[in-house]
Design a protein with these regions (language model features):
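An alpha-helical repeat/solenoid feature that recognizes helix-turn-helix modules
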Residues: 4-29, 48-75, 79, 92-132, ...
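Asp-box/WD-like beta-propeller blade repeats and closely related beta-sheet repeat scaffolds
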Residues: 36-53
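Conserved loop-to-helix junction within protein kinase catalytic domains, corresponding to the end
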Residues: 180-182
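Buried hydrophobic core positions in alpha-solenoid tandem helical repeats
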Residues: 1, 40-41, 82, 86, ...
Length: 184
């Protein structure tokens, strides 16, 4: 591990650092001579990003797409592999959960996956169909007050994740309403 303190069990640490370096105007492919994109995503030193659940796969895809990074043909974890892993782990009825064996969706994870997959919808009909199901279940999850919950706790973080997901799909979040109350 070239970065003291970065976990080799949680690839999202690498992905968050990638985003932070990029946001600060740096180059994640050369941080002190180390390549966070290669080591944290497509040749992931922490192992298969999907081993950290949907969070790992989604954030690996977000890191790769954050600046349109090229992925070598011989890479272990390509965009295609990450997308296929995500699509295979959709819960019945649409959406995703952090846990690969869960049978019900988690709003936060579903929203993260939506904005990770959004750039790939136009090039892959399976991605678009999966996103359509996810958007439907997110619309179904809105409370009477227009909020979203993580578990049974309505909170601004879950609502913010859904807002990001909706806008990544070109949907104005103020147009998504609860069917019974009409609130958004």
């Amino acid at each position: 591990n070239p970065f003291t303190g970065l976990s080799t069990n949680t690839p999202t640490e690498w992905h968050r650092l990638t985003m932070a370096v990029l946001a600060a105007g740096g180059d994640p492919t050369n941080v002190g001579g180390h390549d966070l994109i290669a080591d944290g995503t497509y040749n992931c030193l922490a192992g298969d990003p999907s081993n950290q659940g949907m969070n790992g796969a989604a954030w690996a895809l977000l890191a790769l797409d954050s600046n349109g990074y090229e992925v070598p043909a011989e890479a272990e974890y390509t965009r295609e592999k990450l997308i296929n892993d995500i699509l295979k782990k959709e819960v019945p009825g649409g959406g995703w959960s952090m846990n690969d064996t869960a049978r019900t969706l988690e709003v936060d994870i579903t929203a993260m996956v939506v904005y990770a997959l959004a750039p790939h919808a136009s090039e892959n009909p399976d991605v678009q169909a999966t996103l359509d199901r996810a958007l439907k279940v997110l619309r179904d999850e809105i409370s009477e007050d227009g909020d979203y919950a993580s578990g049974s706790d309505y909170n601004c973080e879950s609502t913010a994740q859904v807002i990001i997901a909706l806008t990544s799909m070109g949907i104005d979040p103020t147009t998504v309403t609860n069917a019974s109350s009409g609130k958004n």
